[in-house]
């Protein structure tokens, strides 16, 4: 019996020791105000006749979640799958935020499950007012939990309060082990239904352990990505000063582990039955520990570690109000892009919100006043803009709000209006004090902003030049653009193609109704190493900005986007990958909403062409696919051409128009990889490493990831 089977056997219900059997109270449990009502659409031909009481379906309890999972976790793809982990971890971190937990352990189990344990107070097990164990209320009813009681949690995260009950709803099995009230307790949920709470051995410890196995019938994939989990947990550790978070991946075999090896996994939570079933011999797994005594200061150091800071000290301050807290850490670097990351109750607010608005307003006001008072700006000079001041700024803003109001189902923007004035007041006071107390560093910061303003003025002139130049072209579009006939952006695609040769083949092979082609003839500038005025003088950048129509930075307007699919098509070699990375850096730094809204894709041209005797050729997009096609063809009795049976494409230019259409551009067969942005801080770091000035950091990154095949695909 394997260790997971042994654990499940140990947790199987023994009705002789059941403290409370909630199955008897299901009717009472389901009759809650949180019942979701959904209209079941009848068939069109019967809709008018049969639409009545029978057409209204009440989705009771967690059935509503399984019926519409996207409403609760955003999607059923990789992002939604990982959100299950975030929900359980958020509950554990809530205990740390409340001052009751110091350690959170997360384990990716070898059988595909996930285990999250904390040393907090433990989920309550006493009988709830509804007549069932409180743990069952938490696990089986939406909008139930301690986060709704300000006495239990002053501040908490979680996805609109639905939390762990949604995890239970979307799992085939969920197990809970609790240490509380002097005993160990356990409960198992099979397809969301509780099997019976069991009381175990006496203990003086406290804490909760939750294990779950995502339902493959709900999710497109049930395979978790270690790096995605690691980034999120590291972020949580930064935001909770002093908290220790351990991540262990039991799916990794000893042979796969390179430099993240431990021989003793005692920190990972194990039940007594697991330990008894396991061998006592040490084994190797992949693990990481995140612990940051400096909190946000360490976060800013992490962001700036591949960049050159222009002042040594990190600005760090905090403030408290009624129902509000804010902590901010910040430092300027010599780069040209801002890296401001905002959080509310440890939730990453990718779209910002009122906390960021308050910070920006105060920062702009304080810097301008200081610059004028110290004569670093003349009275007749125009004020520095927010963009000028935030050039090269790395900052983390973390607020804690007792009654947060988030815009959007997945909490990406904070909406509390009172938070803006609160943050603005704290920042005005603290930033004024820092600038007054650090005149040398302050002068460096102001001078950088002044230099940025000068570049902004030059960039405006460059923009006007681009606009005037565009106006001389037909329709105001770049001359090299082969536009499509469709005028509907939702149906239109823009292929940005490397090289004239491939551009010519793409123009000939495309469907001109909806596919536009923009060939890049010269090398695009590396925007990571250039200020905006230099960037806008680059001919290829001008062509891309004009073709897309959205503008850049503060002038960006996604409503003016001319193509809803932007496909980057480059050679499948190192040079092609470099071109793609340059283009992605441009879009990330100057037109980030294009990525955030899912408009950017990478084309996947084939690597190989298999030429069969008396049969149509086949195309392979990887070495594995090439070997598979070759093996299958030979088994089927096909014969490969002797001289040029397997052709490896060195570039797009080697394919004629027909081949390019059939392999890379035909919507019915092509493979496109959508570029997504789940973690802005991680993306910012990656672009800085790959395209920045730090050669050692880039070499280290390449060395670490050389064996990871994912990075061969850009």
UniProtKB/Swiss-Prot annotation:
Binding-site list for Mg(2+) 2: 571, 573
Enzyme class: isomerase
Catalysis: reaction(s): ATP-dependent breakage, passage and rejoining of double-stranded DNA
UniProt entry tagged with the keyword Ion transport: no
Chain sites annotated for binding Mg(2+) 1: 498, 571
Matches recorded under Pfam families: DNA_gyraseB, DNA_gyraseB_C, HATPase_c, Toprim
Domain Toprim: 492-606
Coiled coil: none
GO biological process: DNA topological change; DNA-templated DNA replication
Activity regulation (record text): DNA supercoiling is inhibited by EDTA, novobiocin, coumermycin and ciprofloxacin.
Protein name according to UniProt: DNA gyrase subunit B
């Amino acid at each position: 019996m394997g260790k997971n089977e042994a654990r499940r056997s140990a947790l199987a219900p023994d009705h002789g020791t059941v403290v409370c059997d909630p199955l008897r109270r299901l009717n009472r449990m389901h009759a809650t105000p949180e019942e979701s009502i959904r209209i079941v659409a009848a068939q069109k031909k019967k809709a008018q006749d049969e639409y009545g009481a029978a057409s209204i379906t009440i989705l009771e309890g967690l059935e509503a979640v399984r019926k519409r999972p996207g409403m609760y976790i955003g999607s059923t793809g990789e992002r939604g799958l990982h959100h299950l982990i975030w929900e359980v971890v958020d509950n554990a971190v809530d205990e740390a935020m409340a001052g009751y937990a110091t350690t959170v352990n997360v384990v990716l189990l070898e059988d595909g499950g996930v285990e999250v344990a904390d040393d907090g107070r433990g989920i309550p097990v006493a009988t709830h007012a509804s007549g069932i164990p409180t743990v069952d209320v938490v696990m089986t009813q939406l909008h139930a939990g301690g986060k709704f009681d300000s006495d239990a949690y002053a501040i908490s995260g979680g996805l609109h309060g639905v939390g762990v009950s949604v995890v239970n709803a979307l799992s085939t099995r969920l197990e809970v082990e609790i240490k509380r009230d002097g005993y160990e307790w356990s409960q198992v949920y099979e397809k969301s239904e509780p099997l019976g709470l069991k009381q175990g051995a006496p203990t003086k410890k406290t804490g909760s352990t939750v294990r779950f196995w995502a339902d493959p019938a709900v999710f497109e994939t049930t395979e978790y990505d270690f790096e995605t989990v690691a980034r999120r947990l590291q972020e949580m550790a930064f935001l909770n000063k002093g908290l220790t978070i351990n991540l262990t991946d039991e799916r990794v075999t000893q042979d796969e582990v390179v430099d993240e090896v431990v021989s003793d996994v005692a920190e990972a939570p194990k039940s007594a039955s697991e330990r008894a079933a396991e061998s006592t011999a040490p084994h190797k797994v992949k693990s990481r520990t995140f612990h940051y005594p400096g909190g946000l200061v360490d976060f800013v150091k992490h962001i700036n570690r591949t960049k050159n800071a222009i002042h040594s000290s990190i600005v760090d301050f905090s403030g408290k109000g009624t129902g509000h807290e804010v902590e901010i850490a910040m430092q300027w670097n010599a780069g040209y892009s801002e890296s401001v990351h905002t959080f509310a109750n440890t939730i990453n607010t990718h779209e910002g919100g009122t906390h960021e608005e308050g910070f920006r307003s105060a920062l702009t006001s304080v810097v301008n006043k200081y610059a004028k008072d110290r004569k670093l700006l003349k009275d007749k000079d125009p004020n520095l803009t927010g963009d000028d001041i935030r050039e090269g700024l790395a900052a983390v803003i973390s607020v804690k709000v007792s009654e947060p109001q988030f815009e959007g189902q997945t909490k990406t923007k904070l909406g509390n209006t009172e938070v803006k004035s609160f943050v603005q007041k704290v920042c005005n006071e603290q930033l004024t004090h820092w600038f007054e107390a650090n005149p040398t560093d302050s002068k460096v910061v102001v001078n950088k902003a002044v230099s940025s303003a000068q570049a902004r003025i030059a960039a405006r002139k460059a923009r006007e030049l681009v606009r005037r130049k565009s106006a001389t072209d037909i329709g105001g579009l770049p001359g090299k653009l082969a536009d499509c006939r469709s005028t509907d952006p939702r149906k239109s695609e823009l292929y940005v193609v490397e090289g004239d040769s491939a551009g010519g083949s793409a123009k000939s092979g495309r469907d001109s109704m909806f596919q536009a082609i923009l060939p890049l003839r010269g090398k695009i500038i590396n925007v990571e190493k250039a200020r905006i005025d230099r960037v806008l003088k680059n001919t290829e950048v001008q062509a891309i900005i004009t073709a897309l129509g959205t503008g850049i930075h503060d002038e960006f307007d996604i409503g003016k986007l001319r193509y809803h699919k932007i496909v980057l098509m480059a050679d499948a070699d190192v040079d092609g990958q470099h071109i793609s990375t340059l283009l992605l850096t441009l879009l990330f730094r100057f037109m980030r909403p294009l990525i955030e809204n899912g408009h950017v894709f990478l084309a996947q041209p084939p690597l190989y062409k298999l030429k069969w005797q008396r049969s149509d050729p086949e195309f392979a997009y990887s070495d594995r696919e090439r070997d598979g096609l070759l093996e299958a063809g030979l088994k089927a009795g096909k014969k490969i051409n002797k001289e040029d049976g397997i052709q490896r494409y060195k570039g797009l230019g080697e394919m004629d128009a027909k081949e390019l259409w059939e392999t890379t551009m035909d919507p019915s067969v092509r493979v496109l990889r959508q570029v997504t942005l789940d973690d802005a801080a991680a993306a910012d770091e990656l672009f800085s490493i790959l395209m920045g000035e730090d050669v050692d950091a880039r070499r280290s990154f390449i060395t670490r990831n050389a064996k990871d095949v994912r990075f061969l695909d850009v």
